[in-house]
């Protein structure tokens, strides 16, 4: 799967690069919204807590639903991995994919993130958010 480096606009506002802001980056990359706008929205939903050390799933879920995104589960407990971070196994379009301890943006088969999180296309996709 192809990979393009993108911090979602974080470097315009913050110097540190090794932070846990994958939810903010993935959403900014997928929506085209400004990093700081997404950061502030998630922080507000997270009771004022920073989004640079991880964002609770409930916060991300609430925000994305408010933005018109739909959750598509690709895995259920006990079923094993059915979909990997692999172009042939994902639909075309813009997706925010949920991986183990990570969110990333995939646009038409290309990963937009700060690193190639596909693990050579073996990484399991638990599900994805798509705008309907």
Q: Where on the chain are the PLM-derived regions?
A:
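Active-site nucleophile-adjacent alpha helix/oxyanion-hole segment immediately C-terminal to the catalytic cysteine
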Residues: 1-52, 57-68
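Noncatalytic regulatory segments and standalone regulatory/sensor domains
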Residues: 113-132
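Conserved active-site-adjacent core of cysteine acyl-enzyme catalytic domains
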Residues: 46-101, 107-116
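Intrinsically disordered, low-complexity, compositionally biased regions/tails
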Residues: 12-13, 84, 131
């Amino acid at each position: 799967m192809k990979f393009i480096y993108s911090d979602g606009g974080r470097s315009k506002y913050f110097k540190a690069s090794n932070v846990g802001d994958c939810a903010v980056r993935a959403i900014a990359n997928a929506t085209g919204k400004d990093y700081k706008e997404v950061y502030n929205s998630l922080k507000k939903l997270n009771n004022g807590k920073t989004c640079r050390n991880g964002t609770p799933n409930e916060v991300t879920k609430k925000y994305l639903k408010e933005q018109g995104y739909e959750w598509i589960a690709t895995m259920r407990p006990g079923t094993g991995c059915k979909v990997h971070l692999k172009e042939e196994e994902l639909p075309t379009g813009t997706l925010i994919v949920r991986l183990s301890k990570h969110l990333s943006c995939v646009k038409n088969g290309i990963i937009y993130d700060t690193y190639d999180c596909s693990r050579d296309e073996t990484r399991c996709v638990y599900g994805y958010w798509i705008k309907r």
